Amino acid sequence: MKQFNDKNFVLDNEVAQDLFHNHAAKMPIIDYHCHLIPEMVANDHKFKSITELWLGGDHYKWRAMRTNGVDERYCTGKDTSDWEKFEKWAETVPYTLRNPLYHWTHLELKTAFGIEKLLSPKTAREIFDECNEKLKRPEFSARGLMKHYNVECVCTTDDPVDDLHNHIEYARNKAADDPMMIPAWRPDKAMNIEKPEFGAYVHQLEQVSGVTITRFADMVDALKKRHDFFAANGCKLSDHGIEEFYDEEYTDSQIETIFEKALRGQQLSNLEIRQYKNCFLTVMAEMDADADWTQQFHYGAIRDNNTKMYNQLGPDTGFDSIGEFNTAKAMSKFLNKLNMEGKLTRTILYTLNPCANEVIATMLGNFQGGEPGKIQFGSGWWFNDQKDGMERQMNALSVLGLLSRFVGMLTDSRSFLSYPRHEYFRRILCNMLGNDVEKGLLPDDRELLGRMVEDISYNNARRYFKFY
């Protein structure tokens, strides 16, 4: 019987073990999409407790705790102690068997704190105290943890109105061995014209850009100024969170009318919203192409399903789910339009619904050319960021594209303890290849396979994003 969470965790055979230990494990991490708070990196934040580090902002854990019957005040409440929240999480962990949270939890305890005990109500106090004692050490600061995990570069997620002062100060003052921190452009608030806060956001954009915005053309000018500012401060990557792709036809005059209606607070039709979003994403894609950035599209989520909890807690608190959208034709038209204009830059497509894996994997091949893996199928995202989901994504990419050109894993996380997800991904990758060798489906060529593993773990991302 194999042991849980030992050095050969998830590695079924000698080939997989060799590929992981001698090729994958040594490669640095380029975490090209995350939700870390830049201020915490810039100030080298010191964590007061394992609860702050582990449970603060982690909607994966909150969701599991709610499902286990834990009262909301132990998830997001302000009137409960760090120990009380941790205790409720420890009570939940034994019920997460076969959920990725069980693997992540114990990988994180082992790789960060050297703790190999299983977290449960019996061990909760001991583990809580041991983690908190270690968090007092300088090597457990935000940057200390990043260096511990061999993180070379992180890309945060930043709004066009952000002043990037944390990125600027960090770049100016960081030590030679500190990881790079690069901003990424996320203009969702400028796209979501149907939101009641859209007008207030446009005013914010006016303030930071110095452009008076009364028309859509003005907003494009303001966004271009901010885009240039981001580029001047190292940004080479954009990201868009969309439900689906849009293909509704529009004219410039229609977009101006729609924009002016929104600024006046008038109700927009569904068609008008979709026309605007199609136009907006096209303009952003053209801007990215001109700047030689990579663009990312995360699509397929139904967000904020629980209105009561959204009103209480706001977005990104664990009330989102997988959507079902018939968007293949719209995606094709969008990419084709950009390609015809010579404005299709490097692109990564992420789907939240794994039913669309083959849709994306085949879509990539329609628009490749000019550089290896120009159009990418993004790693298993969010609910697919687990063993089965990552295997499904890589299997689809393998049979319908070139797995060898894949840019690999990202954390998409708000936590400084999420870097073992890169290790988890690499173990799964090596195990897939090792099992294929064992079955005679791949040759036992360790040089060929080792190079492939190193490329997917690190080299492909380094070449693709052109961060440095």
Q: What role is predicted for each listed range?
A:
Residues F325-M331:
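Divalent-cation-assisted or electrostatically stabilized phosphate/pyrophosphate-binding catalytic cores
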Residues F334-M340:
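Short, basic/hydrophobic alpha-helical segments
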Residues N306:
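Hard-cation-handling environments
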Residues Y310-G318:
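Short glycine/proline- and charge-enriched loop/turn segments
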Residues S269-N270, F319-F325:
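A short acidic, glycine-rich active-site loop
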Residues K2-A291, K343-T345, L349-P354, E358-A361, ...:
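Metal-cofactor-binding active-site regions of metalloenzymes
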Residues Q295-F297:
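C-terminal amphipathic alpha-helical interaction region
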